[in-house]
Amino acid sequence: NSGSEANDLAIRMAKKHSGNKSMMVLEHGYHGHTQAGIDISDYKFSNLKGEGQKNHIIKAEIPNEYDSQKSIKTGLSSAEKAIKQIKNSTDSIAAFIAETIVGCGGQVPLAPGYLKTIYPEIRKQGGVCISDEVQTGFGRLGSWFWGFEMHEVVPDIVVLGKPMGNGHPIGAVVTTAEIAHSFEQGVEFFSSFGGNPVSCAIGMAVLQTCLLYTSP
């Protein structure tokens, strides 16, 4: 019923599919208020009242588009630093999760070229690429329906939240058939009120409205 719960499920799916435990995240990122969400949210664990960075977390710098007028150089430079972190890690990575605009970091768009460079490196590790679209999805960026579209990449998992219901508490995880099948072999996902008909009706109405006003 929320982006937090959806991100929690995405983490479980990534770890089950990859067989790995480590997660790569961005500085100032926020992915929810569950324990698993806090563990991957620098915005939370680096807070003065936070629990600190866990051993299985690899934190990369934000490829900040505002840092340089030549933002493509910024994206590639940040990607190269992240790749070094990946190669220096003793553990293989389960997933890389990022928002395309880092909300709690100051609404910072990721610099061009970053995701196109980092995604293949994550996949070489057997990891999956997660796009957290809780704040950016469903046309909220104007020119793109999904944030990852402006970076010309295709994630392995996409996480959706309340914009799916125009603020109504609803969330979803979209992934490939291969990852979904891997997750079927693990502990069952269960939600007491999952698939609530009222929430589903609201979600469908929002989607139909989006399609009505975004179709050419």
Model-inferred region functions:
Residues Y213-P216:
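Conserved small/polar residues in nucleotide/adenosyl-binding loops
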Residues N1-S4, E27-Y30, Q135, G161-G165, ...:
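Active-site nucleophile and cofactor-binding loops and adjacent substrate-binding regions
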Residues S92, V108-G142:
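Catalytic PLP-binding core of fold-type I/II PLP enzymes
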Residues T90-G106:
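Short acidic, glycine-rich surface-loop motifs adjacent to enzyme active sites
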Residues Q35, E149-S182, G195-I202:
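Active-site PLP attachment segment
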Residues I11-R12, T34-I40, S71, Q107-V108, ...:
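Short acidic, glycine/serine/threonine-rich loops at helix termini
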Residues N1-A95:
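PLP-dependent aspartate aminotransferase-fold enzymes
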